[in-house]
Amino acid sequence: MTPEQLPIEHYEDQLAEKVTRLTTMMSAFNAPEVEVFRSAVSHYRMRAEFRIWHEGDDLYHIIFDQQTRERIRVDSFPAASELINRLMPRLIEKIRDQRLLRFKLFQVDYLSTVSGQIVVSMLYHRKLDEEWQQAAAALRDSLRAEGFDLHLIGRATKTKICLDQDYVDERLTVDGREMVYRQVENSFTQPNAAVNVKMLEWALDSTRHSAGDLLELYCGNGNFSLALARNFNRVLATEIAKPSVASAQYNIAVNQIDNVQIIRMAAEEFTQAMNGERSFRRLEGIDLTRYQCETIFVDPPRSGLDDETVKMVQAYPRILYISCNPQTLCENLTALSTTHDVTRLALFDQFPYTHHMECGVLLTRRH
């Protein structure tokens, strides 16, 4: 596979290999048959990051080969959205002869949406001044004149200049309902929008007719919490990153959802609060005992759940676990399967043509 050519003819083979691998990994837990959710074969990534290589008067996007660290020129990137692919050559064309914009530019990050918005972050090894800002504003305006719904950001050491805003608003139709999700550059968002919708709809289907409330750890910008809110009386969600919490609060308001409460704290801290080991000022005014959480939702980082959180999670009748690393999922399941059964298993092909697998399990406590 090269950055400019995807092995589309091998998509089915690579997906089948993942299904086999996940089935084998999960066999120890008596898991049901894998529900498989495919990706589009191209233009599936909504974000992309490139280094910028300067060669005389020319400059262009590059990536590095993960094995050899060889530099690879990238003029088109079919894994990324069509919007990113349209913008890449136009951006390079416009900054090639603009010394203020190209001088010590070393990276460009793109974050696009299905709704047609895009934010571009330009990273520099130099101080950004008023002159840069004026040149960047002219660049933004000329790209907007070409029809791009675009926002530009300049970054340098300890500097971030937003010409307008540092976010885009994504619009996704989830099980017949349009959801708006504010996504801030440089914070976590699901990269494959179409597969993200499939994940949300699977989570909705897995929690239909739920009793009580939902607790979610690692909620990010509210991606899952807001979609799942319709299945529960109330949702209590935790997140540690400030920009994600701010986005989640905005998303609650813009989607007119009134039964979701976001708390800014780490999952480990929340475990301590739930166990009565520590009190936190951030929890003032929130009576945790009022929540009747029958279901807990976790979408942890690649490292999985720590031992204390695993113990806390085990107290809930139903556990919905989304994992970006089946290896640590299986490590967690070694403990969780002593009290719970795996009743659903899903593979979401977020990252086609790579070894990465995103999967989901629903665990139900044994009686």
Swiss-Prot record:
Keywords of the record: Methyltransferase, S-adenosyl-L-methionine, Transferase, tRNA processing
E.C. numbers: 2.1.1.-, 2.1.1.35
GO CC aspect terms: cytosol
Domain of life: Bacteria
Record-linked Pfam families: tRNA_U5-meth_tr
InterPro entries the UniProt entry points to: MeTrfase_TrmA_AS, MeTrfase_TrmA_CS, SAM-dependent_MTases_sf, TrmA_MeTrfase, U5_MeTrfase_fam
GO molecular function: rRNA binding; tRNA (uracil(54)-C5)-methyltransferase activity, S-adenosyl methionine-dependent; tRNA binding
Gene3D superfamilies to which the protein is assigned, alphabetical: 2.40.50.1070, Vaccinia Virus protein VP39 (3.40.50.150)
GO biological process terms held by the UniProt record: tRNA methylation
Catalytic EC class: transferase
Residues reported to bind S-adenosyl-L-methionine: Q190, Y218, N223, E239, D299
Active site residues of this protein: C324, E358
Swiss-Prot/TrEMBL catalytic activity: uridine(54) in tRNA + S-adenosyl-L-methionine = 5-methyluridine(54) in tRNA + S-adenosyl-L-homocysteine + H(+); uridine(341) in tmRNA + S-adenosyl-L-methionine = 5-methyluridine(341) in tmRNA + S-adenosyl-L-homocysteine + H(+)
Record-linked PANTHER family: TRNA/TMRNA (URACIL-C(5))-METHYLTRANSFERASE, TRNA_TMRNA (URACIL-C(5))-METHYLTRANSFERASE
Function as written in the Swiss-Prot or TrEMBL entry: Dual-specificity methyltransferase that catalyzes the formation of 5-methyluridine at position 54 (m5U54) in all tRNAs, and that of position 341 (m5U341) in tmRNA (transfer-mRNA).
Family affiliation: Belongs to the class I-like SAM-binding methyltransferase superfamily. RNA M5U methyltransferase family. TrmA subfamily.
Protein name: tRNA/tmRNA (uracil-C(5))-methyltransferase
Gene: trmA
